[in-house]
Amino acid sequence: MNIRATRCFLLTCTAIAALSPLSAAAQGLPPDATALQTIVLKGKRVKAGDIVNTPLASHTTEEEIEKKQVQSIEDLGRSLEPGVNYSRGTTNSLNIRGLEGNRVATVIGGVPLTYLQDTARSTAGGAESFDFFALTSVDVVRGADSSRIGDGGLGGALVLRTLEPEDLIGEGRDWGGKVGTGYDSMDNSWYGGAAVAKRVENTSALFLGSYKKGDERDNKGDVGGYGATRTEPNPADYDQHNLLFKLRQDTELGHVFGLTAERFRFEKDTDLRRDQMLTGNYRPGSHSNGQLNERDRVSLDYFYEAPSSDGLVDAAEATLYWQRQLRQDSQDSIRWASVPGVYKRWNDIEESGFGFNGFFDSGFETGGVSHVLTFGTDIFISRAEQYSAGVDSCPASPPYTGVYGACGNLHTNQADMPDVDSKRMSFYVQDRMSFGDSGFTLTPALRYDWFDHHPQATAAYLGNAMKPDTPPGSSGDAWSPKLLAEYELSDTFTLFGQWAMGFRSPTASELYMTFGAPGTYLRTGNPYLEPETSNGFDVGARFGDSDFGGSLTFFYTRYKNFIENRNLTAAEQIARGIDPSAGYMFVQTPVNVSRAEIYGIELAAHKRFDNGFNMRAGLAYARGTNLGTDQLLASVPPLKGIIGVGYETEAWGVDLLWTGVEGVDDQSAASFKAPGYGIFDLTGWWEPEQVKGLRIQAGVYNLFDRTYYDALNTKDYTTITAANEEYYSEPGRTFRISLTQRF
């Protein structure tokens, strides 16, 4: 840990340590005072089989989401979860414990979201296809909990729960709702949303709709115009829509049957002025790109809470669902020098399918040991499709010469991979054993995952410029055990240790993508990839309650068979059936080449005082190394610390938050080594007594207008120089205001 990291570490630890001696003064606090990731050891019962029932999970409520004005994953990591990050650079991905993309999982309403990635055309994203306005809670599960997360959760999971009718219908009422609106100067955006729920006897329904419209994300650049010297952001505008419908039927025997339907759409257009020049291939006003994220989901839901403790099953949940996700990157241009004329592209990658997941808990006793046995399963049958449509002035067939020389590598109106029919199936079992009154709990668990990918030749794929054969199928399986030990020293202090293995199967894109042509370059999939696996250890403690508490976790994880892209040697090309004499500039394919390790520490603490003041602090530090090259992993973010001080009454509150991040290590594989920074945010909220249910939130972010860079957003860019680096900077001072009315 370098000097900058040590300073940040010591400052945050000092704040955490300072909370402890002050605890004696805390008695009777405002009931709605908030804190950074409050740790509650005793409270509402969580089903043993629930994905968040682990000491490695932290919980954020709807109230905290609203008060902290959390509207994105980045907001969550900035104000509440220092170990959660979002990479907007090339991956458009959630990042937990230094892993991102398809190595972390996102689950909403019990349904996993797919991270869509076209490895040939740099299209990626999809796991962020949700709206925070629709959420009732956010849980972050750290590490590979093999008993619940399963395929793709090597780094952890973001578990999202959407509003239920009961969240809006107050006690003694048969209907309720909320409306919200707000403005953010960071991207000149405003949003509006409304949700209403109604109950008739044992039947309840909820409908929610929200809309957001904005422009480009601000930065600290001040050079406008066109070309590579521009540091102001490219002009952009976006629209976001979200719809949610739920129908629930309660029974008097503890069963709840439901129907859920969701529709999410995000669409953005950007004027690429940095790529335009008066005499260049792209002229001013004639070069833009687009981005589209879509997600549709319909599910039948089932919940069960046993009305008494003498039944065989204590609790159960199940979801039968259909889901479709689409990611599209597009280009709308006129070219002037190379391939002159209209140039349009629509690059799509889509996955749709049917799935089922569920579990049940069964409690019983043997001797002096209390057991809660959980059985569960996850099944998903899907089809992945990729297609690139386009319009350009390229001749219908080669040879391509003169201004059309680039046409040899401008492949369009083709599929870069076959349609892929996939099946994923898993079963898991765990037994939470409590040994009398000793406070000791032991939870062994075992999960079995199986996958099968079967490519289907289509006319669009057979028309690929490489004229490929249909590749072979790919299948595999894995056993992932877990052992969790917990020792409750008191009602408010628990020690824990966990060993768990994790698993990620190769994606259809990694297996079967083919893009290129002789004389240019070739990117090709690898149908013989092995799954990635992890072997991790966590030890730590959780203590306290909502008034004074915290957590401390140390973790170490080894990863095997990491999938990375690598250029093939001539001998390797021959072994793959590729002719090196075809004149490829390079041949790149994903291979299982590396082992890696990531270790670190996570801390959180909070304290609330009887005079209305509160303090909180958090820290996330991780270090990751590619053991094949001894180079630091670029996907592992630098140390981040958060220190906050606030004051609250029953009607209003104010918070001052400092976020400090160290600079990227010189040994990192990151192309750009982002320097460290420290920024302040000032936020507040007010609930006027005259208007019941109204809450107004406001905040000033980056209070002192610092210029800083996000390490994950910039790690893959090789063109950053001292002259243009402000184009890649984060927003300066911005403000945000929002209003929520419950009725």
Task: List where the protein language model places each region.
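Flexible loop and strand-edge segments within Gram-negative outer membrane beta-barrel domains
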Residues: 234-236, 254-311, 325-350, 518
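Periplasmic-side early beta-strands and strand-to-turn transitions of outer-membrane beta-barrels
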Residues: 166, 173-180, 184, 188-291, ...
